[in-house]
Amino acid sequence: METVISFTAIAVAIMIGLAALGTAIGFAILGGKFLEASARQPELAPALQIKMFIVAGLLDAISMIAVGVALFFVFANPFLAQLG
């Protein structure tokens, strides 16, 4: 039983860590491309900014889903029920 709990804790840590890393890399690429496009065509900056915020919200949603799944595994671990 302790093995299942410890492996679940490791899986949760990896899940949250990779979600944070992916979100950080995504924001870095998104911000860089937004600045590059705004510098190239300044008249499109407001339209690009709206699209950037939409994509930023979707990037945040991915990490929030990972946190939700991780909390599910921490507090309602389905693997403990199989042990008996």
From Swiss-Prot:
It is a multi-pass membrane protein. The chain crosses the membrane at residues 10-30, 53-73. The record marks 60 as: Reversibly protonated during proton transport. It holds the Pfam family ATP-synt_C. GO terms for molecular function: lipid binding; proton-transporting ATP synthase activity, rotational mechanism. F-type ATPases have 2 components, F(1) - the catalytic core - and F(0) - the membrane proton channel. F(1) has five subunits: alpha(3), beta(3), gamma(1), delta(1), epsilon(1). F(0) has three main subunits: a(1), b(2) and c(10-14). The alpha and beta chains form an alternating ring which encloses part of the gamma chain. F(1) is attached to F(0) by a central stalk formed by the gamma and epsilon chains, while a peripheral stalk is formed by the delta and b chains. F(1)F(0) ATP synthase produces ATP from ADP in the presence of a proton or sodium gradient. F-type ATPases consist of two structural domains, F(1) containing the extramembraneous catalytic core and F(0) containing the membrane proton channel, linked together by a central stalk and a peripheral stalk. During catalysis, ATP synthesis in the catalytic domain of F(1) is coupled via a rotary mechanism of the central stalk subunits to proton translocation. This is ATP synthase subunit c. It comes from Shewanella sp. (strain W3-18-1). The lineage of its organism: Bacteria, Pseudomonadati, Pseudomonadota, Gammaproteobacteria, Alteromonadales. The gene is atpE.
